[in-house]
Structure formats: structure tokens, C-alpha cells
Amino acid sequence: MSGFPTQDFVALVPVAILTMGALVLLMTEVFLTSGRRAYQAYLTMVFAAAAAGYAAWMPVPGNVFGRQAVVDSFSAFVTVVLCAGLALSALVGQSWLNARNSERGEFYALALFGTAGMVLLGMATDLLIAFIAVEVMSLSTYCLAAFLRRGKKPAEAAFKYVVLGSISSALLLYGSALLYGASGSTLFSVLPRGQGSALYLAGIALVAGGVAFKIAAVPFHAWTPDVYEGAPTPVTAFMAAGVKTAAFAVLVRLFLATESGSAAMSTSLGTVLSALAVLTMIFGNLLALPQRSVKRMLAYSSIGHAGYLLVGVVSAVVAGARDKALAGLLFYLAAYTATVIGAFAVVGALERRTRGDFEPADAWDLDRFAGLARRRPALAFAMAVFLFSLAGVPPTAGFIGKFYIFKAAMGAGLYGLAVLGVLTSVLGAYYYLRVVLYMYFLPSKDEAGEVVLSAPSLTIALAAAVAVVVLLGVVADPMVRLAQAASAIIL
């Protein structure tokens, strides 16, 4: 402890705030009655805001803990996005869990612990720190996936997530060991020393596979639809936004360091990443097309969005358009966080209640959305905004994000990836706009037993998400400038 200067520990204040918040919630849980547990969601928001505020106005950036982690504009931007996603997820979770009499402090504590791991992952510049952060994030999301112990789906989702996630962790750890053997260090910046050896190639492939699992890139995507569908809907929203943001942050840092070696290695890395992007965009959108479950459709579409983000990574890491591509990627992550959490919030609000309990068997079917504009016009409007953003329809945040990523790809000479991204976006628009068609142009089906959540916390979450999606689409310049500043100072 005495070997590190005080500023190293000061850099971890956002992580400490989130961790302390989790401990506070666990301790206060003992003294709260069921009627007062709603305050825990708002307390979670306070800790998230404190961590985000400190990250945004943090003192002088730099490498900390012997260059094992870094505080820079990139990590600050990622931290703010992650904390904003946590706050929205807490609001959505409060209404969803309260309706099921399942609201408990450990839900918010686990979300805070998970976000602490995500924030640390965004700062990591060392394989061991990255692995620790991944495990903190993963263990929290494993528990959250099984939080609602009713029926087989949550248990099945959590079991699949744990088993496949353990394989992912094994790939990451074994790959780290091989990279250490090849380069003599676990620091990202030192890894290129081992380039050219078989150990290095095997290690970087295994580490990339472990991270690809977290972002749900093809062919590491198989867990996504079952886990997203079986997990509690607020947890699905939290995972879809937070895990993807943190994983892409560490992926960018790792590959920016890795490509600094030989030109041959950079070319090989670009080929592999491009192949992953192509497969992920194509299969993510194709598999989403036939889905009648809106929740499962959103799960498959998240795979497609990982493909678009990979285009940004390829442009930044390999093709030399670093600043523009990173700015587009950061903007996209911010827009996607608000959009996907909002979309899952609407899906959760429509889950059917039968025989006194919520029955998810048909809760997410397209027929549940038929005529929603007449029954719940505000809810239908919010869902339409989120779907337009996911489809990349102007003037929404999703359109601006895709525009900047594909523009960076074109500027870097990656015309094939850019054109494929546009084509798969058009394909994705079909299944997104199909839901809008059901909501606005088809008559309602049997509404017997329907219960639509309308808690104040859900209303706040949806209003905030809609505002972000619309404002980032109409007045994008301030956020674009912030993303450009964050991408320009990545240490």
C-alpha cells in the first residue's frame, strides 16, 4: 500500500463510491420495511451520480498503480455512461420488482458491485486488472440473472450464463498466461514485445475470444438470447447496456496497444476483427428477423449492434482513423445505453399478470403490442422512439451513432464494412418497424388479465431515456464534441 502514491488511490474514487454504495444498501436493508425499499433505488441513483460526477471532474489524469490502470478522458466518458445506465436500470428495476413483491436491497447492491467492476474494466491497462474487473462484473450479473427465483426460465438463464461465462473467463485467463509467457509482462503496452511468437498469437486469440463473449460477437453469441429472455427484464437491460460498454472499452485499449507492433500483426488483427464484425452484423440481424418474442428479438438485435461497434473498433485500431472512429464508438455506446434500457423497460411494463402472478410465456409476444397506441399511447410513443433509434432512423441518437461509425469506416477505406453495415441496418429496420406497425395499425388482441406497470419510477426512467434519445439526435454536437475530446486523450 505504501508503495503507491496517494493519487493512485484517488483515481479509484468512482469505484470506491460504487462499492461503498453497495455496502450501505446491504446494511440498510436490515432496517427497512417493504414499503420503504423504494428509496433504495433512489439511493442507488445518488451513488451513481456521485461516481459519475467525480469521474467527470477528476483531477489530473494519468497512469496509476504502476501503469496497471489509467485515468483519462476515455475512462471518464465510459464511467459516466455506465453510471447513467445504472441509474436508469435502478429506476426500471424498482417498478418491476415492486410489482412482484420482490424488491430487496441486494438487487441494487449487486448492480452497484457490477458497475464498479465495469468502471474498473474501463480503466484497465493490465491483463490481471482486466481479469479481476471482468470477474467482479460477471459474478454480479450471474446473481442478478437468477434474482427472481420463480419458474424455470430465470434459473436456466443463470445456469447457462454461469457455465458459458466460466468458459469465457477461462479463455481470458489462459490467454493472459500465454501473453505473459510471450512478452514477460501483463501490461497492455508491453505485450507487443512478444509479437511473432506462437505463444503471442495463441494468447491474443484466447483473450479476444473471452472479450468477444462479453460483447456477444458471433460465434460467441449463443448465450445471449436465452439469458436475455430468461433473466428479469431490468437485469437484461442492465446487462445489454453496461456489459457491452465496459467490454468494448477494454477491447479498444487492448487492441490500440497491440497494433503498435509490426505491420503484419496489425493487418492480421484487422482481418480477424473485420471477419468478426461481418459475421456479427449478418447473423445478429438475420436471427432477429423471425422472432415473435420482442424480448428475444431485442436480444438478437444486440448482437447486430455489437457488429456495428466492431466496425468502429476496426476503423480505430487498424485503419488509422482512430480519433473519428473512437468518437463515433463512444457516442454510439451512450446512445445505445439509453435506447436499449428504455426498450426493455417498455417490454417489462407489458408483462402479463395471470392467476395473481406474472406469467412470461406470452408476455413478450408481438400480439401483446397490437393496439398499444390506443391502450397506452405514451408507452407506445416511447417504444416507437426507442425502436426508431435502434433502427437508425433520423433524427434519433441511433442514427447519429451509426452515421459517425460508418463515416469513420469510409474515411479509413473500409468501404465493404461500411456498406454492409448500412445494408444490415436496413434489414434490422424491418423487425423494429414491425413492432411499430403492431402498436399503431393493428387492433388489440385479448386484453384479459393485462396489467401495465405505471409506477412513478418507470415514468421517470422512460421520460429520461426518451429525452436522451431525442436530444442526442436533434442536438448531437455537444455530445459529439465530448466524445471527440474523450477519444483524443486516451493514454
UniProtKB/Swiss-Prot annotation:
GO terms for cellular component: plasma membrane. This is NADH-quinone oxidoreductase subunit N. Keywords: Cell inner membrane, Cell membrane, Membrane, NAD, Quinone, Translocase, Transmembrane, Transmembrane helix, Transport, Ubiquinone. It comes from Anaeromyxobacter dehalogenans (strain 2CP-1 / ATCC BAA-258). PANTHER family: NADH DEHYDROGENASE. Pfam families: Proton_antipo_M. NDH-1 is composed of 14 different subunits. Subunits NuoA, H, J, K, L, M, N constitute the membrane sector of the complex. GO terms for biological process: ATP synthesis coupled electron transport. NDH-1 shuttles electrons from NADH, via FMN and iron-sulfur (Fe-S) centers, to quinones in the respiratory chain. The immediate electron acceptor for the enzyme in this species is believed to be ubiquinone. Couples the redox reaction to proton translocation (for every two electrons transferred, four hydrogen ions are translocated across the cytoplasmic membrane), and thus conserves the redox energy in a proton gradient. It catalyses: a quinone + NADH + 5 H(+)(in) = a quinol + NAD(+) + 4 H(+)(out). The keyword Transmembrane applies. The chain crosses the membrane at residues 12-32, 45-65, 73-93, 112-132, 162-182, 198-218, 237-257, 269-289, 298-318, 327-347, 380-400, 424-444, 455-475. Its EC number is 7.1.1.-. The lineage of its organism: Bacteria, Pseudomonadati, Myxococcota, Myxococcia, Myxococcales. GO terms for molecular function: NADH dehydrogenase (ubiquinone) activity; NADH:ubiquinone reductase (non-electrogenic) activity; quinone binding. It is an enzyme of class 7 (translocase). It is a multi-pass membrane protein. Coiled coil: none annotated. It is found in: Cell inner membrane. Its main location: membrane. Belongs to the complex I subunit 2 family.
